[in-house]
């Protein structure tokens, strides 16, 4: 009888072990769904897998369940790459959790209107979990936020939909962009760890780090990261070098050079890639690109994080959503500073610059919305109020190391550098917001703006016609979407008009004003497309 080889038995044992493990996990998952009679289960889903966020939400959920023993809160963290497919499947299948994180780029108007419940009325009521806070107890829930949930321009706030004129989410945090740096490496290279105050000092620091690496033979890069990280720097530089141009182009004269205005003014020829301020903004990449890691265009966000945490990169530009992971995992002291702007008197980049861009308009992030198929909508809203109370928001910020969003909540120790810069000027023109394909064009041709052969002229020659078409395509798409939105809102307006005043009439007035604005924007877009037809 032929003996069965040892490795065959080993493979069989591993297969059997895997089967047993999977069976146990499946049994545990199913038993968790069995709840005692009368227990209300609230499920909350999000894609924030950064260290500290899930722990913070778990801690707050435990506090809530201790206060309400008949309630169970279940957190559902979903990987970002699978989020969109998972979200649509859950909503269409009627199996969506009670609370879902919202983002305007993931939740179009039709999705919000069909699958989510507006929370505007609840936001106008006091938050009972602030009853012990004298300055908050009588305020509407909306006004307990540091920025009082003012609707964001262009819908970038995620929690409010300008077309539907409703609040759909209650945010949990603020996010800013900072350059994180390894204090030990900076001290070794420069003798101190004072963060740079100007762009020239930033470039000088990069040069000092590069020379330090050459002297010591260490495999060290001044700047770590990928395209994801580098665009956090270029966005700041683009937005400051072109500030005066934005003021010239802002025909609404409201200091908010919106995406709509940006695209229409481009299509009308009021500015282009050849405009001196825009051309100069493209040259900013060349000024620091020689300090980027080899192959950075092909690297991913995770690669940049690993470079920094392993001490192979001295600095990393990213959002404060990564702060918790950096501060918890780094085995070295970490500092942070805002991407330094150009001064007005900068010999090369100061001509169209006003100064540091204000972050006062930083809008609240990570909003959770209430789904229409929630079995316990009042309970879900109650938990959302608890999550965004002053006490819970302080705990969330302390554990996650993210910025607080509620009035009076202190910034956690060690994160003071993340606070939004209140003073400053309006932002300028950023070519990355020129329609859906504009960002892809930049990413695909980034190599023309960096390296030994960097040339803004070559970039413009290669991409100008691509931008021309991308902008017109985006204007046409926006006009179609606006037309559909206006059509849908007409029936809502008719219903509100015949509803008894006064409260519904107030909403009618607001919706009518928004409707007129949408129609104006659509007519402007159609006129531009008539004058500059797509070929």
Segments and roles (model prediction):
Residues 37-51, 71-76, 99, 168, ...:
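Short, well-ordered beta-strand elements
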Residues 2-22, 424-535:
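Conserved C-terminal helix/tail region of periplasmic/extracytoplasmic solute-binding proteins
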Residues 211-214, 273-345, 379-388, 394-395:
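Ligand-binding pocket segment of bilobal, Venus flytrap-like solute-binding proteins
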Residues 203-206, 248-298:
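Glycine-centered hinge/linker elements that transmit conformational signals in sensory
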Residues 107-176, 347, 353:
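Hinge/lid segment of periplasmic solute-binding proteins
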Residues 77-86, 199-201, 296-310:
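Short helix-initiation/N-cap motifs at beta->coil->alpha
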Residues 50-70, 180, 184:
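Short, polar/charged alpha-helical segment
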Residues 72, 188-189, 303, 328-402:
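Extracytoplasmic/periplasmic substrate-recognition and gating elements
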């Amino acid at each position: 009888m032929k003996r069965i080889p040892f490795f065959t038995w080993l493979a069989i044992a591993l297969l059997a072990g895997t089967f047993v493990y999977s069976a146990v996990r499946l049994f545990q998952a199913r038993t968790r769904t069995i709840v005692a009679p009368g227990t209300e289960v609230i499920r909350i889903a999000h894609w924030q897998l950064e260290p500290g966020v899930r722990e913070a939400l778990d801690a707050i959920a435990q506090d809530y369940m201790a206060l309400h023993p008949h309630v169970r809160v279940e957190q559902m963290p979903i990987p970002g790459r699978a989020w969109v497919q998972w979200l649509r499947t859950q909503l269409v299948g009627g199996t969506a959790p009670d609370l879902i994180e919202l983002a305007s780029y993931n939740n179009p108007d039709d999705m919000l209107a069909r699958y989510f419940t507006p929370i505007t009325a609840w936001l106008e009521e006091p938050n009972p979990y602030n009853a012990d806070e004298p300055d908050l107890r009588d305020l509407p829930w909306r006004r307990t936020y540091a920025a009082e949930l003012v609707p964001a321009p262009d819908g970038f706030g995620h929690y409010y939909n300008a077309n539907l004129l409703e609040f759909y989410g209650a945010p949990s945090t603020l996010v800013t962009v900072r350059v994180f740096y390894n204090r030990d490496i900076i001290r070794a290279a420069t003798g101190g760890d004072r963060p740079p105050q100007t762009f020239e000092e930033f470039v000088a620091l990069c040069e000092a780090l590069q020379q330090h690496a050459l002297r010591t033979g260490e495999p060290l890069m001044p700047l770590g990261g990928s395209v994801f990280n580098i665009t956090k720097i270029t966005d700041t530089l683009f937005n400051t070098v072109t500030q005066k141009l934005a003021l010239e182009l802002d025909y609404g004269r409201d200091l908010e050079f919106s995406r709509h205005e940006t695209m229409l003014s481009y299509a009308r020829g009021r500015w282009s890639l050849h405009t001196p301020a825009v051309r100069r903004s493209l040259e900013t990449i060349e000024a620091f690109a020689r300090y980027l890691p080899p192959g950075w265009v092909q690297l991913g966000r995770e690669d940049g994080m690993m470079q920094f945490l392993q001490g192979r990169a001295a600095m990393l530009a990213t959002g404060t959503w990564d702060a918790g992971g950096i501060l918890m995992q780094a085995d070295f002291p970490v500092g942070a500073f805002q991407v330094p702007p150009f001064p007005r008197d900068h010999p090369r980049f100061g001509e169209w610059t006003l100064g540091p861009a204000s972050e006062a308009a930083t809008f609240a992030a990570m909003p959770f919305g209430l789904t229409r198929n929630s079995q316990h909508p009042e309970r879900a809203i109650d938990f959302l109020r608890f999550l965004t109370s002053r006490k819970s928001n302080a705990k969330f910020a302390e554990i996650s190391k993210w910025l607080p969003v509620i009035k009076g909540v202190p910034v956690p120790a060690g994160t003071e550098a993340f606070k939004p810069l209140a003073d400053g000027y309006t932002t300028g023109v950023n070519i990355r917001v020129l329609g859906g394909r504009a960002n892809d064009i930049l990413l695909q041709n980034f190599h023309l703006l960096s390296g030994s052969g960097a040339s803004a002229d070559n970039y413009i020659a290669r991409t100008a016609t691509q931008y021309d078409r991308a902008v017109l395509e985006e204007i046409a798409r926006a006009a179609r979407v606006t037309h559909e939105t206006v059509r849908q809102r007409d029936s809502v307006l008719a219903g509100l008009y015949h509803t008894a005043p006064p409260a519904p009439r107030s909403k009618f007035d607001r919706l009518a004003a928004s409707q007129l604005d949408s129609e104006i924007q659509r007519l402007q877009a159609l006129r531009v497309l008539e004058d500059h037809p797509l070929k």
